[in-house]
Amino acid sequence: LTASGADAYLLHVTTTPSVAYIARVDDFDCGIMISASHNPYYDNGIKLIDCYGEKMPEETMLLVEDYIDDKLHVFDKDWAELPFAHREHIGCTVDYVAGRNRYMSYLISLGIYSFKGVKVGLDCANGSSWNIAKSVFDVLGADTYVINNKPNGLNINNNAGSTHIEGLQKFVVENGLDVGFAFDGDADRCLCVDEKGNVITGDHILYI
């Protein structure tokens, strides 16, 4: 990106929703998320987000995919040979942890009610929510208990998170918690369980 003249703002380990939020509110041209989503680490791919915080059109993503796979020369030689920027136009890399912190502040601002006294269980899937979810619930006043919050780059979604809700169900019941939330690796999916370990469906969450 920088070699082609773009400036890259690094949010570091963060969630897909945070990239979408920052792309929109900070007027970026686009957002890029490297993620395996709810899959194993070796399925890492690229999620492309437009300046409105929405998923880019399918045709745009297919164009990028063809460029990566070196297929574009068949259709358009100019696209296939994108030039590097001249030295004076090379982009810069910016450490933008402040953007992730801004997203966390936004989440906290959405809290209408205090969670004081509520025992909340979180399953972070050893993914990108590990350094966000607990901090948000703590500020909202919850007594927060967390599992699968030690990512090492290989253990993401490994018998953890929203695709393995049984782990959170057991954790909530055994520790007498009031509610539990399980995220997938990039935290754009969430499942909820009640104090008895029953899964709260998406319809119920939407209603709440």
Task: Give names to the regions the model predicted.
Residues 1-43, 135-193:
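N-terminal small/polar loop signature for handling phosphorylated ligands or for N-terminal nucleophile
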Residues 15, 129, 202-206:
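Catalytic-loop motifs flanking and including active-site residues across diverse enzymes
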Residues 21, 67, 103-106, 183, ...:
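Aromatic side chains
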Residues 28, 74-75, 208:
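Short, charged/polar low-complexity linear motifs in solvent-exposed/disordered segments
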Residues 39, 53-54, 127, 187-188, ...:
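Short, glycine-/Ser/Thr-/acidic-enriched flexible segments
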Residues 44-173:
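Gly/Ser/Thr-enriched, mixed-charge loops and adjacent short helices
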Residues 48-51, 191-195:
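Short beta-strand-to-turn element immediately C-terminal to the catalytic PLP-Schiff-base lysine
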